[in-house]
Amino acid sequence: MYGESLVKLMLALDVMDEKKAILIAKETSEYVDSIKIGYPLVLATGLNIIDKIKESTNKEVICDFKVADIPSTNEKIAELTLNHADGIICQGFVGSDSVSAILNVARAKNKKVIVVTEMSHPGATEYLQNVAEDMAKMADRLKVDGIVAPSTRPERLKEIKSIAKDAFVISPGVGAQGGNLSDVLNVLNENDYVIIGRAIYENENPKNAAKKYKIQM
Ligand code: O7E
């Protein structure tokens, strides 16, 4: 039914209205493997939106709070978030003690931790890019479940993925940010996810847009 590479599709559901979020999540769920919810939707509607999206789609929901604090605060954020979500995204630049605090909470709840390395926007080349390989090494050493690396720079995606070799990759940048899907699919495999937001939820027919991407994967 779908393409050869079988890379997974993660919908970035950054709308700010509960009804719209649930409608788009339901409409696209046939073509989506996982749903990423972040500050826009949670701040607009509350953490319970995670349970509502899970109930209405039966999909895994990953919470994207890019947590970046000292260990004890990270632990509190992870505890509250992982009472709802299947996984949590945190920043790697805060260091291994802060990431480990989240990992400890997640392991106790059998949930996933995904660490950001290099981000996809142009500004990521100013600071983050310089330490992205080191963060990928830390992710490998700590045995986190997944890492985030950019679809806007496929050569960097490849390099970072080769360092954190046991982690799955979730990669944003295809669609609105200009990343090229086929370049990215050359790097990713069946454990990895392409993250797409606006190119699906801002389309006048989100279901068709999700289908269009999924059949290429
Ligand atoms: O550009 P879009 O609309 O397809 O959405 C991309 C999503 O990925 C959006 O939620 C944004 O916040 C997120 N993202 C990036 O775009 N770049 C990054 O480097 C990292 C993320 C991200 O989600 O980090 C955690 C996966």
UniProtKB/Swiss-Prot annotation:
Q: What Pfam family is a match, any one?
A: OMPdecase
Indicate whether Lyase appears among the record's keywords.
Answer: yes
Active site positions, chain numbering: 66 (proton donor)
Q: Which Gene3D superfamilies did the record assign? A: Aldolase class I
Top-level taxon of the source organism: Archaea
The answer to whether the entry has keyword Secreted is: no
Instruction: Return the InterPro entries for the record.
Output: Aldolase_TIM, OMPdecase, OMPdecase_arc, OMPdecase_AS, OMPdeCOase_dom, RibuloseP-bd_barrel
Which controlled-vocabulary keywords does the entry list?
A: Decarboxylase, Lyase, Pyrimidine biosynthesis
User: Which GO molecular function annotations are given, in alphabetical order?
Assistant: orotidine-5'-phosphate decarboxylase activity
Q: What is its EC number?
A: 4.1.1.23
Annotated residues that bind substrate are located at 14, 36, 64-73, 120, 172-182, 197-198
The record's listing under PANTHER family reads:
OROTIDINE 5'-PHOSPHATE DECARBOXYLASE
Q: What does this protein do?
A: Catalyzes the decarboxylation of orotidine 5'-monophosphate (OMP) to uridine 5'-monophosphate (UMP).
The protein in question is named Orotidine 5'-phosphate decarboxylase
Q: What is the lineage of its organism?
A: Archaea, Methanobacteriati, Methanobacteriota, Methanomada group, Methanococci
Q: Which gene encodes it?
A: pyrF
